[in-house]
Design a protein with these regions (language model features):
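Residues within the DNA-recognition helix of helix-turn-helix
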Residues: 74
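Hydrophobic alpha-helical core bundles mediating ligand binding, dimerization, or RNAP-core interactions
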Residues: 30, 108-118, 122
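Short, intrinsically disordered or compositionally biased N-terminal tails of bacterial proteins
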Residues: 1-18
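Basic, amphipathic "hinge/linker" alpha-helix immediately C-terminal to the N-terminal HTH DNA-binding motif
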Residues: 90-114
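N-terminal helix-turn-helix DNA-binding core of bacterial DNA-binding proteins
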Residues: 21-70, 90, 97
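Short, basic amphipathic alpha-helical segments that act as recognition/interaction helices
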Residues: 55, 119-122, 126-127
């Protein structure tokens, strides 16, 4: 069951239209995953969007160390990877909302495991 899920996911990843992404050859599923979520703020963006729709300004408040330029870049890369949806409203001032796609939502157990591991690590470090 898990093997077929990962094979299906890998097939979807390898069928992406992005030329740079298509030229990559992955030797391991972990490598493919990290190529999608390995950016400096990507995991934090994904974590904050679990079960929510947020505007750019809300993401900025939740991830204060990200500059607007870097946050925009990371959001674009996640959108190109089909992990999030960017919805633009034709209003003044401009309104843009971000939410996870089904593929992005499928990362939830991984992100929750990272959260648990990080919590234990910090506890053991006395932080």
């Amino acid at each position: 069951m898990k093997d077929s899920y990962f094979l299906d996911t890998m097939n979807k990843i390898n069928q992406k239209n992005d030329e740079d992404f298509q030229s990559e050859e992955f030797h391991c599923p972990v490598e493919a995953t990290l190529s999608l979520i390995g950016g400096k703020y990507k995991t934090l963006i994904l974590w904050n969007l679990i079960g929510k729709t947020l505007r750019f300004s809300e993401l900025r408040r939740l991830i204060p160390s990200a500059t607007p330029k870097m946050l925009t870049q990371q959001l674009r890369e996640l959108e190109e990877a089909d992990l999030l949806i960017r919805k633009v409203y034709a209003v003044v001032p401009p309104k843009v909302e971000y939410s996870l796609t089904p593929l992005g939502t499928s990362l939830r157990p991984i992100l929750e495991s990272m959260y648990e591991w990080g919590s234990q690590y910090l506890l053991n470090q006395g932080t």
